[in-house]
Amino acid sequence: MSEKTVERGRRKVRIGYVVSDKMNKTIVVELEDRVKHPLYGKIIRTTSKVKAHDENEIAGVGDRVQLMETRPLSATKRWRLVEVLEKAK
């Protein structure tokens, strides 16, 4: 018998900064997106905050982290921590 492997969709990967780590195994990360205004051409910075799963609780406030999209882990968590890219100073 041969096992069939199901191809999964590509997961989104984002880089952002931790703004809160007060919850158990959860961090709040601020993601920044830069969009060019369609008419005037000015680059506009928009930010969004997402909750991410941090199983080992290694990330702290101010850390630069990499997140990956995952299945819904709770009512508001849809991201998980991949790695801490840079610790806060």
From Swiss-Prot:
Keywords: Ribonucleoprotein, Ribosomal protein, RNA-binding, rRNA-binding
Pfam assignment, any one: Ribosomal_S17
Gene Ontology biological process terms, A to Z: translation
InterPro entries noted in UniProt: NA-bd_OB-fold, Ribosomal_uS17, Ribosomal_uS17_bact/chlr, Ribosomal_uS17_CS
Record-level Gene Ontology MF annotations: rRNA binding; structural constituent of ribosome
A GO cellular component entry from the record: cytosolic small ribosomal subunit
Record's keyword annotation contains Ribonucleoprotein: yes
Gene3D superfamilies xref list: Nucleic acid-binding proteins
Keyword hit for Acyltransferase: no
Complex formation: Part of the 30S ribosomal subunit.
Family that this chain belongs to: Belongs to the universal ribosomal protein uS17 family.
Function, in words: One of the primary rRNA binding proteins, it binds specifically to the 5'-end of 16S ribosomal RNA.
Protein name as it appears in the record: Small ribosomal subunit protein uS17
Organism of derivation: Nocardia farcinica (strain IFM 10152)
Lineage: Bacteria, Bacillati, Actinomycetota, Actinomycetes, Mycobacteriales
Gene (UniProt): rpsQ
